[in-house]
Design a protein with these regions (language model features):
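Flexible helix-coil transition and linker loops at the boundaries of alpha-helical arrays
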Residues: 55-69, 98-102, 132-142, 176-187, ...
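Structural detector for short beta-strands of small beta-barrel domains
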Residues: 318-337
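TPR alpha-solenoid repeat register
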Residues: 74, 109, 142-143, 188, ...
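OB-fold (S1/OB) nucleic-acid-binding surfaces
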Residues: 331-359
């Protein structure tokens, strides 16, 4: 397509606008599915295709520019072609604005105008465009963009009446509606996965069910062959696995994302995970036995609620241990580069060393020397092999503040974390 010559002025009839439409669709197909290792190659190819599409548009004969609907369509196509690049384009906005004035029923023009205005930071006006588009009837593309915009709005908090969580809940709602309009459309499922992933962070990175819902949506997205080459899908799927502590799956997906689009930083995410695993593995193995004995003897007693019975780590089953409480001492706070979770090395009364991962609490909430009680502990044995490295340790995961007592007390409101993830504007 990039090598096509500009059409000649002799091209007349209804085919002229149809050919511009076809060229514009090809332009956006390349934008959304072409991911070379060098981003400059993509920019160059898109620019060539955009020039070809504009040349086709300029060649549309005068007789195909007479009615308001024809002029609206041509203004829309020109604005859409100019808006294909990531940065805001004033000329694109002008053409798209003319299109919706000439034909207020042109849904695609409202959608593109909203995307264009979003790029210059006017999120409220962008939302108005999407809302006007939806007033013409349900539309999966508009619903997806509205869902993305609501996530973006939740990060900058520009609407005082709507708090962050409400906006993200609306984002999930609109993403679901888009997916239900076409259950085979991978992009809609991908958008829903992103909405759940953002929701996990907005609600304090403490509800792993949101991560699981995110992965289910991504799995549905992958059923669409058009999504197989999307590096953002691989990267976001890897992110969900990372926070579910499915380390090997996360490593494989980040590596896949890095091979598809190096600019996303998948290689750096792999490095971070390996670094964390090394720290966790070595911390379990390197603590001196003398220190272990001293800490274990100083555990003391914590009175448990009747619903719980005391247990040690070695007696736990894989998964959630309902009705069980583990008393342990914090030996070491383990620093790392990610926003969550909080990692600590603990020891129980049997001198069993294990890693505690805590989601939803501020980093300073648990300190070395603290005595913690883990209620209904979610236990697993981590065993990861990756390119010659092998890490193995016992892990208890805490997703909610109500699952942990620190020195016999529930975490205070000040100790509960609130993290966030920025939504990317990707049409």
């Amino acid at each position: 397509m990039s090598g096509e010559e500009a059409p000649q002025a002799s091209e007349t009839g209804d085919n002229a606008i149809a050919m511009v439409t076809e060229a514009t669709e090809e332009l956006y197909r390349v934008r959304d599915t072409y991911f070379p290792r060098d981003p400059a190659d993509k920019t160059s190819r898109i620019r060539t295709l955009a020039d070809t599409a504009l040349a086709r548009l300029d060649s549309v004969p005068v007789e195909q520019r007479k009615s308001a609907q024809q002029r609206a369509m041509l203004e829309f196509l020109k604005g859409k072609i100019l808006d294909v690049f990531p940065d805001y384009n004033k000329e694109a906005e002008d053409h798209l604005s003319k299109a919706v004035k000439l034909n207020p029923s042109l849904v695609d023009a409202w959608l593109c105008l909203g995307n264009c205005i979003w790029k210059k930071g006017d999120l409220v006006s962008a939302k108005n465009c999407f809302t006007l588009a939806l007033s013409k009837g349900p539309n999966k593309k508009v619903l997806c963009q509205l869902s993305m915009l609501e996530r973006s709005m939740s990060q900058v908090n520009i609407i005082g009446q709507e708090d962050q969580a409400t906006l993200v809940d609306e984002s999930i709602k609109h993403a679901k509606e888009a997916a239900m309009l076409d259950i085979k459309d991978g992009n809609s499922w991908y958008n829903l996965g992103n909405a759940y992933l953002t929701s996990f962070f907005v609600y304090g990175a403490c509800e792993h069910t949101k991560l699981q819902n995110s992965l289910k949506a991504y799995q549905n997205a992958e059923k669409d062959e058009l999504m197989n080459s999307n590096p953002d899908l691989s990267f976001n799927c890897a992110t969900a696995h990372k926070y579910l502590e499915n380390y090997e799956r996360a490593l494989h997906r980040f590596e896949a994302a890095a091979s598809q689009d190096p600019s996303l930083g998948g290689d750096e995410e792999v490095r971070k995970i390996i670094s964390v695993l090394d720290k966790l593995d070595s911390s379990v193995k390197k603590v001196r036995n003398k220190k272990l004995t001293s800490m274990a003897l100083n555990l003391g007693e914590i009175s448990l609620e009747p619903a719980y019975r005391g247990a040690t780590v070695d007696s736990l089953s894989e998964g959630i241990n309902t009705g069980v409480a583990v008393l342990a001492k914090v030996l070491l706070f383990i620093k790392h580069d990610n926003i969550a979770p909080l990692y600590c090395l603990l020891i129980d009364s049997n001198m069993c060393r294990f890693i505690l991962s805590v989601f939803g609490l501020q980093f300073e909430s648990v300190k070395e020397g603290d005595c913690v009680t883990l209620l209904a502990p979610n236990y697993r044995e981590v065993d990861v092999s990756w390119k010659g490295k092998h890490c193995q340790f016992k892990l208890i995961r805490v997703d909610f503040a109500k699952q942990i007592l620190i020195n016999g007390r529930r975490p205070s409101l000040r100790q509960i974390a609130c993290t966030s993830m920025i939504s990317q504007n990707k049409s």
